[in-house]
């Protein structure tokens, strides 16, 4: 700009902008030629997707590699701490004398480090599914949390969870298998409701304290899943989209 010749040169704002635009155009041509010549950017280098292991994702536990978290453009995937535990899977059926309990085994949670998904932030790009070493897609198979009950009910995938506080209680609403379930927990007391049942029990002995009404068998294992996820996502040290929304709501409600 005249410095090389020792001449003073002052550009007007318009001249400076034209100079920047032209420099960017010329630089882009250089970048283009370099990219086309670099095999790292060629089709042959990217025809194969990331390696898959052949295993399938489930609601709990996975490789815990966390690859799905940084590859999401919207930060929709996050981690949760869930205690290692065995969730009892049982079915309760109404009978003239109360309820008959059929135990089906347990659902093991082996890893404290769990992956979860905030569906409100997801644009269904599938990028996390591409990079996940397991099949199924974290955005679909992992616990899908929603920021409102309306968003949960409107979701086309038909599965997920909405968690909120109601006074001292924690309420978890879930859509599972095309059904809407609601679990209300306050202290040790729980109320588990669905389209054809309304049960009450104590978490210290769920199977032994069941009372209420049901028009058929009820999967009590689903209540354990809702309870575990609700407690985990709102745990005091957890910082995630659900706990943040809960903290904001409590702050707005405080005098």
What are these regions (language model features)?
Residues 1-55, 125, 166-255:
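Iron-sulfur (Fe-S) cluster-binding modules
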Residues 1-121:
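Ferredoxin-type iron-sulfur electron-transfer modules and their immediate structural context
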Residues 65-71, 75, 125-138:
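Cys/His-rich metal-chelating microdomains
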């Amino acid at each position: 700009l005249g410095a090389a010749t020792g001449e003073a040169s002052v550009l007007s704002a318009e001249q400076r902008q034209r100079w920047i635009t032209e420099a960017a155009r010329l630089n882009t041509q250089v970048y283009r030629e370099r990219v086309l010549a670099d095999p790292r950017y060629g089709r042959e280098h990217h025809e194969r997707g990331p390696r898959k292991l052949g295993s399938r994702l489930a609601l709990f536990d996975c490789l815990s590699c966390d690859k799905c978290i940084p590859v999401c453009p919207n930060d929709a995937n996050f981690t949760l701490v869930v205690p290692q535990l065995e969730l009892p899977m049982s079915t309760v059926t109404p009978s003239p004398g109360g309820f008959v309990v059929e135990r089906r085994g347990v659902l093991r949670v082996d890893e404290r480090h769990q992956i979860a998904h905030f569906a409100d932030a997801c644009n269904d790009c599938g990028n996390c599914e591409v990079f996940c070493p397991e099949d199924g897609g974290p955005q679909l198979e992992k616990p899908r949390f929603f920021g409102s009950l309306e968003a949960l009910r409107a979701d086309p995938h038909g599965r997920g969870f909405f968690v909120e506080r109601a006074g001292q209680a924690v309420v978890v609403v879930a859509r599972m298998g095309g059904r809407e379930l609601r679990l209300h927990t306050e202290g040790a007391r729980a109320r588990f409701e669905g389209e054809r049942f309304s049960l009450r029990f104590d978490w210290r002995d769920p199977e032994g304290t069941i009372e209420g009404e049901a028009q058929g068998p009820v999967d009590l294992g689903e209540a354990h899943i809702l309870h575990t996820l609700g407690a985990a996502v709102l745990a005091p040290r957890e910082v995630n989209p659900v706990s943040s929304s809960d903290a904001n709501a409590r702050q707005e409600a405080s005098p």
